[in-house]
Amino acid sequence: MFGKSIEAYTKACEVIPGGVDSPVRAFKSVGGTPPFIKKGKGAYLYDVDGNKYVDFVQSWGPLIFGHCDKDIEKVVIKTAKKGLSFGAPTKLETKLASEIVEMYDNIDKVRFVSSGTEATMSAIRLARGVTGKNDIVKFEGCYHGHSDSLLVQAGSGLATFGSPSSPGVPSDLTKHTLLCEYNNIKNLEKCFADSSDIACIIIEPIAGNMGLVPASEEFLKACRELCDKHGALLIFDEVMSGFRASLTGASGIVKTKADIITFGKVIGAGMPVGAFAASKEIMSNLSPEGKIYQAGTLSGNPVAMAAGLKSLRKLKANPDIYDELNKKALRLVNGLKKIANKYEIPFQVDTRGSMFGFFFCEKEPKNFKDVGLCDFKRFATFHHEMLKKGFYFACSQYETGFICTKITNKDIDACLKAANEVMKNL
């Protein structure tokens, strides 16, 4: 069933570290060999062995309209024919930035970059420059990209490999990263009591790299109040949740407002792009207006801007999309929960918009430590058995799943039928 993928992976390992260009893809969390994908269309992936899968990963979130959406595909081809990159300003950047600014009451200006990592890295530099302080607060299990100062208990791939941080990261950098427990207000208060040099808190308001674990309203309120009290800035990392959890991401669901928001994934519709945004008072500190430097050769490249612009305009023109996506996500996870209960399997589920998560555990996880208590062996078995039946879930208990518009109720019901067969023997 996977012979050609195994062959492809073996060859890849000879010239690419671990055979992949992002660690989680190597299936280390669940074991085995990853399928090598040949193409995607709509809700489906097709691998080199000819296997077809309903895709509940959607490239880890960007493809809210599924693979090869005709509207996005059309503008990408049209734009690419005019040039892939100019290293000069284009109107497309202004149009996409304007679309984003119009949607948020706490954003005046946007700066585009080429990845989510660049977005969070730049947002932290901006916060440090604006406040004149050095320390940053992050939370166990929240992943903010692979820049040096953020690779501390980062969840996702690092969690899979059991690394609290990565070799190659100088202690001189991580000493300014203060680690707190997610959803633990007392722990956060102590952090601020211990340091008078905190520039910012960076948080995933809906954590997606320890499975799906939302921050409580009380916790986000505490983040806001502590930042205001101590002259720090609050950064929402919405690289994953932006335009996914709702039209305005997690920011549109929670009551707390951030000073800086980072974006990625959906705003590129599958193209490499990231962004960070804030008020004009904060953003005016960026070069060339201000003294805080940030740059990128491919930042704001026209193809990514065109794809993102079409994606956002489609979302804004169809406000019912999020309700429909959430209903599908609930149909899936509630169905899985019902099956798990039938077979007396400890199982927890949650959704936010088109994002979903499930855990093989007794109680609903509230933080990284809770997720670590889940049954990872059972998850791995479930993952592989569902893969054999044609359903492609995230290959780690620490990852979030995604619904796209092309996934149908028929696809979900077929998935639940397969899950019933798997869980009765799990």
Curated annotation (Swiss-Prot):
Record field: catalytic activity: (S)-4-amino-5-oxopentanoate = 5-aminolevulinate
Q: Which Pfam families match?
A: Aminotran_3 (PF00202)
What are the protein's UniProt keywords?
Cytoplasm, Isomerase, Porphyrin biosynthesis, Pyridoxal phosphate
Localization per record:
Cytoplasm
Enzyme Commission identifier(s): 5.4.3.8
> What CDD domains does UniProt report for this protein, alphabetically?
OAT_like
- Chief localization class? cytoplasm
Q: What pathway is this protein a component of?
A: Porphyrin-containing compound metabolism; protoporphyrin-IX biosynthesis; 5-aminolevulinate from L-glutamyl-tRNA(Glu): step 2/2
Which parts of the chain span the membrane according to its record? none
Subunit note: Homodimer.
Q: What is this protein called?
A: Glutamate-1-semialdehyde 2,1-aminomutase
Provenance organism:
Aliarcobacter butzleri (strain RM4018) (Arcobacter butzleri)
